[in-house]
Amino acid sequence: MKDTIRQLIQQAITQLVTEGVLPEGLTPAIQVENTRDKTHGDFASNIAMMLAKPAGMKPRDLAEKIIAALPAHEDLSKAEIAGPGFINFFQNTQALAARLDAALGDDHLGVRKAGPAQRTVIDMSAPNLAKEMHVGHLRSTIIGDGVARVLEFLGDTVIRQNHVGDWGTQFGMLMAYLEENPITSDELSDLENFYRAAKQRFDESEAFADRARGLVVKLQAGDPDCLELWTKFKDISLSHCQKIYELLNVKLTMADVMGESAYNDDLINVVNDLKAQGLLVESNGAQCVFLDEFKNAEGEPLPVIIVKADGGYLYATTDLAAVRYRSGKLKADRALYFVDQRQALHFQQVFAVARKAGFVTHPMEMEHMGFGTMNGADGRPFKTRDGGTVKLIDLLTEAEERAYALVKEKNPQLPEADLRSIAKVVGIDSVKYADLSKHRTSDYSFNFDLMLNFEGNTAPYLLYAYTRAAGVFRKLGKDFSEVGGQIELHAAQELELAAKLAQFGEILNNVAEKGTPHILCTYLYDVAGLFSSFYENCPILAAETPTQMHSRLRLTELTRRTLKQGLELLGLKVLEQM
């Protein structure tokens, strides 16, 4: 609806330019927002205040002329001036009701992508292998998954790329430690403790560290024995990751793994191509690219190091190879990198070098979707009591156990199997939603008590709202397919819920554009709150007439479907009963 209003305003401005009321050459960014008080309309624009000065008119006078020039539209009943010059737009309730009825007959709930479908690469999760995933991997994994799901729902071809750290010193450490301490494959499955012991030896013994580095050199040279061990370590580590992805209900598979090692053969080509273009400069023995737009605090050029003085490659080298692959081989139109925002400068430099070097052969928009840190209650990065890194599996297990205690307290009569299955959904959903509901770029404090609360913007609250809507049809004893009639909007609670449901497509397009799932979380929370008000104030099964009951059942069903679809796009599971 907002896009429709923007188009109508643009047509009115064009008309006023033709009439000489407005000067030529105006290209205003037309803003249309939802109103808070629906008695003053459903949407508002400040366009008259933006253009009053170039028009040489008072905002309210210009607003009058814009309203007079607005083309009629069936979805709008009227437009009015408010305050110093706002233009408020009122939806046609009959047209709104018809749109919602149409959404009920559409698998996509009437949602369409605002622009053309694209091929989009999602760079997400990307843990360093050789050890288990920890809480620091949660945000990239679930935010990337949520955005990928939304883009797919809107019609994009999404290519997930799990750029795991599967190459480097850590594998030399593991191989050196295995030489000293031969163990069975079963013992090796406890990779975390094995890695910790190897790291301790690496830090304490220079001789061990030298052996580890030597094994890395052999690995890079293609030594068969080293490659066999490396493959074993990698497979064990990836199997750990896959269990986490399945537990988190994240759409990542082994087929999506495209780790650092996948680009090894192209790294020398990256270096040679940069050299051939005269972009590589030697600095303190390292091969670097200097770009004018990157300088340090003293105004000196910042290097993008491509090859270290010892001949080793860096993340930038691999990322440049990945850019070239994603543009040239995958033919992506857009590449979204869900990586900690502390890597912002790194990606700015990589993207700039890639463009300068012509590595983006297929037009591809590259965006670093940086995110903030998950902190403990003290506001510091989340750690164990002894200061160690919290394993992701331990966090999720604790979430399930806490949810189990909560569900059992509220429903002690439920069978044990039901308690466990409900607790698993509530626990995992709560951890994910607590993260996804925060702005992507913000830090936040992890708090089990808040995220498992049945009040406020939490997963349990939304799950309950969904089961409440689904419960209406259980009480009715009929499936929705048996419900006829059409939506009619009269009560204030009906109108407010209907207007919010009609915004679903706009919300999803915002998530797709900005890579910010919290927008969808806020929307679903609003829908749940408005449905609660509707449920309490507008009798559904006890409606005054069959026509009214059918209308309210249809609103309830659209609410149920919207909540379910929205939660599933966030990667959350729903419960039919709690």
Curated annotation (Swiss-Prot):
PROSITE patterns: AA_TRNA_LIGASE_I. InterPro entries: aa-tRNA-synth_I_CS, Arg-tRNA-ligase, Arg-tRNA-synth_N, Arg-tRNA-synth_N_sf, ArgRS_core, DALR_anticod-bd, Rossmann-like_a/b/a_fold, tRNAsynth_Ia_anticodon-bd. SUPFAM superfamilies: Anticodon-binding domain of a subclass of class I aminoacyl-tRNA synthetases, Arginyl-tRNA synthetase (ArgRS), N-terminal 'additional' domain, Nucleotidylyl transferase. It is found in: Cytoplasm. A motif ('HIGH' region) lies at residues 127-137. It is an enzyme of class 6 (ligase). GO terms for biological process: arginyl-tRNA aminoacylation. Keywords: Aminoacyl-tRNA synthetase, ATP-binding, Cytoplasm, Ligase, Nucleotide-binding, Protein biosynthesis. It holds the Pfam family Arg_tRNA_synt_N. It catalyses: tRNA(Arg) + L-arginine + ATP = L-arginyl-tRNA(Arg) + AMP + diphosphate. GO terms for molecular function: arginine-tRNA ligase activity; ATP binding. Its EC number is 6.1.1.19. SMART domains: Arg_tRNA_synt_N, DALR_1. One of its GO terms (cellular component) is cytoplasm. Its main location: cytoplasm. Belongs to the class-I aminoacyl-tRNA synthetase family. Monomer. This is Arginine--tRNA ligase. It comes from Pseudomonas fluorescens (strain ATCC BAA-477 / NRRL B-23932 / Pf-5). The gene is argS.
